[in-house]
From Swiss-Prot:
This is Orotidine 5'-phosphate decarboxylase. The gene is pyrF. Signal peptide: none annotated. Gene3D superfamilies: Aldolase class I (3.20.20.70). Catalyzes the decarboxylation of orotidine 5'-monophosphate (OMP) to uridine 5'-monophosphate (UMP). It comes from Vibrio atlanticus (strain LGP32).
Length: 231
């Protein structure tokens, strides 16, 4: 399987609609992201349905808890066979290290473990509101460095931070980028956005795209078009 760069965010409150969409696209063209709403509604069985169809799944639950609890949740994700799982880097080094260590018995079959830095909806005023008197980019760099030092595989970050992070943390450190909108797409609720080709040029490894694909009349064609710009 090619290392698909597009991760389609499945944001549905209806499992039948989600699977109807999934059945219109090819597992060779993308991976799928299951977030808090869908997982809370439909649970591990929904992930199994996606696996049955041949898709790799990014379980986007952003675990953030004491090290023992967080690491056990990460292990549960590994047992489910997901391709990627994430934790909040602001949970600290001990939490992230425990989560990494619990995956070691899975060897090459373990999921990628990714840290969440600063949510792409957050601006400087939002950080100030939680007592952080710095620019989003500064906090991203601080948390990304902590994530790497904890031995994780990469971080979720906005495309604007990608080149800076690649330069500081190395080419092997994976960057997963939400806030991606193909040319002409609606900006939605993401504050820091970029087109797919620009994001890859900037250093992003994986691109999270939702509504521009899930709400398209012909999602397979949109995927083909975006993948074409990344070739």
């Amino acid at each position: 399987m090619n290392d698909q760069k597009i991760i389609v965010a499945l944001d549905y409150d209806n499992q039948a609609d989600a699977l109807a969409f999934v059945d219109r696209i090819d597992p060779a063209s993308c991976r799928l992201k299951v977030g808090k709403e869908m997982f809370t509604l439909f649970g591990p069985e929904f992930v199994r349905e996606l696996h049955k169809r041949g898709f790799s799944v990014f379980l986007d639950l952003k675990f953030h808890d004491i090290p023992n609890t967080c690491s056990k949740a990460v292990r549960a994700a590994a047992e489910m066979g997901v391709w990627m799982v994430n934790v909040h880097a602001s949970g600290g080094e001990r939490m992230m290290t425990a989560s990494r260590e619990i995956l070691e018995p899975y060897g090459k079959d373990r999921p990628l473990l990714i840290g969440v830095t600063v949510l792409t909806s957050m601006e400087q005023s939002d950080l100030a509101g939680i007592g952080l008197d710095l620019e989003p980019q500064q906090q991203v760099m601080r948390l990304a460095s902590l994530t790497k030092n904890s031995g994780l595989d990469g971080v979720v970050c906005s495309a604007q931070e990608a080149s800076l992070l690649k330069g500081a943390l190395g080419q092997e450190f994976k960057l997963v980028t939400p806030g991606i909108r193909p040319v002409g797409a609606d900006v939605g609720d993401q504050k820091r956005i970029m087109t797919p080709s620009k994001a890859i040029e900037s250093g992003s490894d994986y691109l999270v795209i939702g509504r521009p694909i899930t709400q398209a009349i012909d999602p397979a064609a949109v995927l083909a078009e975006i993948n074409g710009t990344l070739a």
